[in-house]
Amino acid sequence: MSATLINVDDGDAMEPTLQSILDQRSLRWIFVGGKGGVGKTTTSCSLAIQLAKVRRSVLLISTDPAHNLSDAFSQKFGKEARLIDGFENLSAMEIDPNGSIQDLLAGQGEGDAGADMGGMGGMMQDLAFAIPGIDEAMSFAEVLKQVKSLSYETIIFDTAPTGHTLRFLQFPSVLEKALAKVSQLSNQYGPLLNGFLGSNGTLPNGQNLNEMMEKLETLRATISEVNTQFKDERLTTFVCVCIPEFLSLYETERMIQELASYGIDTHSIVVNQLLFPKPGSDCEQCTARRRMQKKYLEQIEELYDEFNVVKMPLLVEEVRGKERLERFSEMLVTPFVPPS
């Protein structure tokens, strides 16, 4: 996977690398997303490797049900953060964004607001199920549990295809509104419930109503804080990944518009799988495809002239394993130069 690399300085032009993300020390949340099959996981893994060089601790999280992180690093990951082999400050975990609310409401240990939601009374579970989007949104609490307890400096999300990603980014708002509603109902009907429960306020399953509401309020405050951080460009950014084809470009534009409506910063696009036929090549298919790619690449550059557009080559070998990912990651910060 050899590539010639050079430093480029185009004056006022946006730098065609992700170096600005590495340089922005304030960034805490980085999302990597795009249409399926465009190289999101390879890009997110490579970006995580580069960030690990300049950050104290980095956590890479997959929210894609396909869970390709394990394949990319040739190492099994689960819902608990685990150090990636060969790194001292880069960890990874895979969560299911469509996880069942029952799993998350089941007891998950002590010491954290999200985890302590376990043991909820049946009444509160019924209330939670009635809130639209809560089933997926509760999986976000699993992320908060890990992030809050382990204090990573930077968190990178390897997201699911576009539609799922946009829903996932709404989860903090969904949870915040849901928990606020639960709190409101508790305030309205709390005195009535306490009349039935008695002086100790104990639910039939042994859970204390007042303690449960305090835990919910703590979780709501945490989620509210994260929701605010997602909309702060100093703390959060989204890296769009695409290939130079019509559908991928269309999905990228839709995603950028949606992100803008959520107030989430995005100023970087990684264009993968670019063909660079060797001079004098008689491969007609390669030349024709390069011509098509060039057309869409020009559209990307015209539409997103204020973005960092990173151009990544189509490689002859699969990018799997630490060494190949490290080599690929270098092209995110130093532009690839096609053979002349």
UniProtKB/Swiss-Prot annotation:
Its EC number is 3.6.-.-. One of its GO terms (biological process) is tail-anchored membrane protein insertion into ER membrane. InterPro entries: Anion-transp_ATPase-like_dom (IPR025723), ATPase_ArsA/GET3 (IPR016300), ATPase_ArsA/GET3_euk (IPR027542), P-loop_NTPase (IPR027417). It is found in: Cytoplasm; Endoplasmic reticulum. Keywords: ATP-binding, Cytoplasm, Endoplasmic reticulum, Hydrolase, Metal-binding, Nucleotide-binding, Transport, Zinc. It holds the Pfam family ArsA_ATPase. CDD domains: ArsA. Zn(2+) binds at C283, C286. Gene3D superfamilies: P-loop containing nucleotide triphosphate hydrolases (3.40.50.300). This is ATPase GET3. It comes from Chaetomium globosum (strain ATCC 6205 / CBS 148.51 / DSM 1962 / NBRC 6347 / NRRL 1970) (Soil fungus). The lineage of its organism: Eukaryota, Fungi, Dikarya, Ascomycota, Pezizomycotina.
